[in-house]
Amino acid sequence: MKIAIITGSAGLIGAEASRFFHSKGYTVFGIDNDMRKEFFGDEASTRWMRLDLEKSLKNYRHFEIDIRDAAALGNVFREAGSDLALIIHCASQPSHDWAAKAPHVDFGVNATGTLNLLELTRQTAPAAPFIFTSTNKVYGDTPNRLPLVEKETRWEVDTAHPFFKHGIDESMSIDQSLHSLFGASKVAADVLVQEYGRYFQMKTVCFRGGCLTGPGHSGTQLHGFLAYLMKCAITKTPYKVFGYKGKQVRDNIHSHDLVEAFWQ
């Protein structure tokens, strides 16, 4: 038996990963305590997804655990034992605004929670791949220094710039920029994941995603803008655009495409 531990398993990427790797023959140990409801209110609750996973996936087991609780996490890792073959860490506090209001909670979930998972992986399954859903917010406001051209309907990177064709890559610095407290806690987690890979020779990887979307997203005004926009359109609720003359450009990535990249 192959076991995959997936945190944030009822969220957008975690649920997609749970279904995908279950279809590949993994038994999935899903960890999610619906903290998204605490962050954003009842409309953001992921309980509906948890119930759907438990109903539709034969080999899915759910653990309602806070990833800041190292002892509770340890019990899950020990139960998985030598069958633990993969860790996908999707759980996070994802809001800039919420992080500013509760920085200790934000850092505890994003940084300390990640450290707990890395250390348990090192202790119990050091050969298992550890996939971390980081964020493009690790770059802070550095992208704002790119040569931007204002067009009639959008801002666009100058076509002569190397990032124009394929977007920003890891050559962009994460230093000397304004990150928000959320971005800073994710930087800490991102660097920890890299360091465990290099220092302990573990198989770790960071995916610095942004504007991820899909049918499993419990979108709210503060997070999950495309899902929230669709919800507003369906319910005929006004949708508010903040700043930049409404010319922001976002390249949305479907959750299935990201999880397929995990597999590749």
Please describe what each predicted stretch is:
Residues 1-210:
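N-terminal Rossmann-like NAD(P)+-binding domain of SDR-like oxidoreductases, especially those catalyzing
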Residues 224:
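Glycine-rich phosphate/pyrophosphate-binding beta-alpha loops
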Residues 99-100, 165-180, 204-218, 228-253, ...:
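A conserved pocket-lining segment of Rossmann-fold NAD(P)-dependent short-chain dehydrogenase/reductase
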